[in-house]
Amino acid sequence: MQIFVKTLTGKTITLEVESSDTIQNVKAKVQDKEGIPPDQQRLIFAGKQLEDGRTLADYNIQKESTLHLVLRLRGGLNVKVRTLTGKEIDIDIEMTDTVDRIKERVEEREGIPPVQQRLIYGGKQLADDKTAHDYKIEAGSVLHLVLALRGGNF
């Protein structure tokens, strides 16, 4: 089947894919056509960032669907946010991002308001006004997400 990938410059790339293709496969096809390394690609469909190991079928992407390609900034790094259910969310951050900004990224992906999020790294709860750099968060780091009950102060 054919799908389309639209870049931020407005260019549309046509790809021949199968619904069983993984997002990683799709990124490889984008690389073949455009020369953009997969690790710099972020594919978005219906407002959600698509995860490499999932398939087009997992996201109900059908023929003639349009994905949006966003390039990851150099200097950015990918971290994982692990929920209490064990689900891992991949998030791109910059070293200069505040914890509050990281929480906004979690909200974009999961719909959880930042005020309800507590992020833990290295056994410490992270303060909203501190940066990833302050906590020495690096690529591949795993942050733990705990939900704060409304009205509960920790």
From Swiss-Prot:
Cross-link (Glycyl lysine isopeptide (Gly-Lys) (interchain with K-? in acceptor proteins)): 76, 152
GO biological process terms on file: modification-dependent protein catabolic process; protein ubiquitination
Record SMART domains: UBQ
Keywords, alphabetical: Cytoplasm, Isopeptide bond, Nucleus, Repeat, Ubl conjugation, Ubl conjugation pathway
Pfam families per record: ubiquitin
Database matches in PROSITE patterns: UBIQUITIN_1, UBIQUITIN_2
GO cellular component: cytoplasm; nucleus
SUPFAM superfamilies: Ubiquitin-like (SSF54236)
Cross-link (Glycyl lysine isopeptide (Lys-Gly) (interchain with G-Cter in ubiquitin)): 48
Propeptide, chain numbering: 153-154
Ubl conjugation as UniProt keyword: yes
Domain Ubiquitin-like stretches: 1-76, 77-152
Record has Transmembrane helix as a keyword: no
GO molecular function term, any single one: ubiquitin protein ligase binding
Miscellaneous notes: Synthesized as a precursor protein containing a N-terminal ubiquitin-like protein fused to the ubiquitin-related protein.
Family indicated by similarity: Belongs to the ubiquitin family.
Protein's UniProt name: Ubiquitin-like protein-NEDD8-like protein RUB3
Organism annotation: Oryza sativa subsp. japonica
GN (gene name): RUB3
